[in-house]
């Protein structure tokens, strides 16, 4: 389990989306916006501060649109993480830009270098509105990143995002999806002590005895995390430790 936890913690540090309010969805003042649009029209949009990715990050649909009018690729990848404008917009909670990019043909399943999708980013930011918009336009509910094989539901369970987790499940996400090390969303929710997520997952068919690569179940994880109320809930639904299952020949 230690390897799996290290991986999960690294993932938390990597994604880091769900920015403070002052950093997301904040349109520039009209004068600044007009200057940016003019520079884009003049073909000076190679500068980072007025690039299509920066405009998507800032939540500036007019500048994004002007970049596209000037021939910028709606699915262009940046040099930092291989993110497309849609990944930036989804990650920073800029729904208006997300909507516009989708109408302009943005790939809703575009992947960054590490395999994260716009839906992963929206889930990480606990943005139900953007998550639903992406799903309704074809986003893969069960897409996994390249290295750790983490699906959006793993991420929602880890971070305790109940509304987004509920949306993913309602739309058909696999509740017993396993990551690279065999961990399920229920493993994540139990370790972090997210009682409401645990209840939600179990109510929708999560296996309380799913084993990770080390043969440990959610009950093993929660007992290390010291969340007694979750231990009781898992036991109520037939949850056992890996050792108990092994003794029973399972």
Where do the language-model regions lie?
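Sec-dependent signal peptide recognition
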Residues: 2-8
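Intrinsically disordered, low-complexity regulatory segments in ankyrin-centric signaling systems
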Residues: 4, 16-70, 99, 103, ...
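Ankyrin repeat boundary/linker residues
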Residues: 45, 78-79, 112, 145-146, ...
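Ankyrin repeat (ANK) core detector
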Residues: 50-53, 84-87, 117-120, 150-154, ...
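Ankyrin repeat A-helix N-terminal signature
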Residues: 54-60, 88-94, 121-127, 155-161, ...
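Ankyrin repeat structural motif
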Residues: 60-68, 94-102, 127-135, 161-169, ...
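Leucine-rich solenoid repeat scaffolds
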Residues: 208-250
